[in-house]
Amino acid sequence: MELVFIRHGFSEWNAKNLFTGWRDVNLTERGVEEAKAAGKKLLDKGYEFDIAFTSVLTRAIKTCNIVLEESHQLWIPQVKNWRLNERHYGALQGLDKKATAEQYGDEQVHIWRRSYDISPPDLDPQDPNSAHNDRRYANIPFDVVPNAENLKLTLERALPFWEDQIAPAMLSGKRVLVVAHGNSLRALAKHIIGISDAEIMDFEIPTGQPLVLKLDDKLNYVEHYYL
């Protein structure tokens, strides 16, 4: 069986080189075109889906909608869940990546961005931009909503959704599309493929490119490739 991952199209803050994380930003025109191209590619390759999973962030939701529309499948059920959100970049969210490197040093910023288990500084829960002040997370316990994450914590947060929603859907015979974010998809790919803590640092997923994970009937990894 096949599982298709798509990272959202190029966003406004990708274009501005800002740390985004859980901040809710829109797609650029380039991002819209990437999503359209992904949908057309899926249509041309004959990919059909029974259900789509995405995050609760606009850039992923819009990408999912565009992909499904272009592949003539906008009617299928979509499940939106915060566990597929991008990695939370803590107090770095909204900061310019280059300016942050100049302030803290390239090495420190590289550690925050690429270390598997070291998180950036926490975002104050009282900050106006904190997820604690966003009603889309109102039903999540206060101590469960992150203030900063590394990739390890992102995987720990995303894994229950894989186990409770995505994997059961696939095992029941449903054809699944997941449209999410660079780090939430990398985290899930790490689990599915069996990528080591060291190797995952160099495993990248480009925006708007369908990644196909081929699995056996017990969801054991076989191979992966881009369309």
UniProtKB/Swiss-Prot annotation:
Location of the active site: 8, 86
Entry-linked InterPro entries: His_Pase_superF_clade-1, His_PPase_superfam, Phosphogly_mut1
Tree of life domain: Bacteria
Pfam families reported in the protein's UniProt record: His_Phos_1
Keyword hit for Isomerase: yes
Reaction it catalyzes: (2R)-2-phosphoglycerate = (2R)-3-phosphoglycerate
CDD domains found in the cross-reference section: HP_PGM_like
Residue numbers marked as site, Transition state stabilizer: 181
Enzyme class: isomerase
GO biological processes: gluconeogenesis; glycolytic process
Pathway stated in the Swiss-Prot or TrEMBL entry: Carbohydrate degradation; glycolysis; pyruvate from D-glyceraldehyde 3-phosphate: step 3/5
UniProt xrefs under SUPFAM superfamilies: Phosphoglycerate mutase-like (SSF53254)
Alphabetical UniProt keywords: Gluconeogenesis, Glycolysis, Isomerase
Example GO molecular function: phosphoglycerate mutase activity
Gene3D superfamilies recorded: Phosphoglycerate mutase-like (3.40.50.1240)
EC number(s) given by UniProt: 5.4.2.11
Function summary: Catalyzes the interconversion of 2-phosphoglycerate and 3-phosphoglycerate.
PANTHER family: PHOSPHOGLYCERATE MUTASE
Protein family per UniProt: Belongs to the phosphoglycerate mutase family. BPG-dependent PGAM subfamily.
HAMAP family tied to this protein: PGAM_GpmA (MF_01039)
Oligomer and partners: Homodimer.
Record-given protein name: 2,3-bisphosphoglycerate-dependent phosphoglycerate mutase
